[in-house]
């Protein structure tokens, strides 16, 4: 998994590529925790994510809870396979997905 981060005054955009699983989820969690900065909005661009495990879902849920307190979080460019996981687990109802 690779992570690229772009920051502006309004938002932090984290571009994720690869698999989000038990091996890579801690790196994503660390990036979210350390790189949000003062931004009130977090965008997770998932156009290159082909797979997400329960460990990845846990990271997204934690990020969502954190961002609800200070602003907003949305996921963009979610592929069909990952969207299927979100729908089966109920995360499609919890997360803002565009």
Locations of the language-model features?
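Short leucine-rich amphipathic alpha-helices used at interfaces
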Residues: 2-3, 34
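STAS-typified acidic loop motif
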Residues: 3-29, 48
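Amphipathic alpha-helical interaction surfaces in cytosolic regulatory modules
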Residues: 22-94
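Short acidic-hydrophobic, aromatic-tinged amphipathic segments that line or gate anion-handling sites
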Residues: 96-98
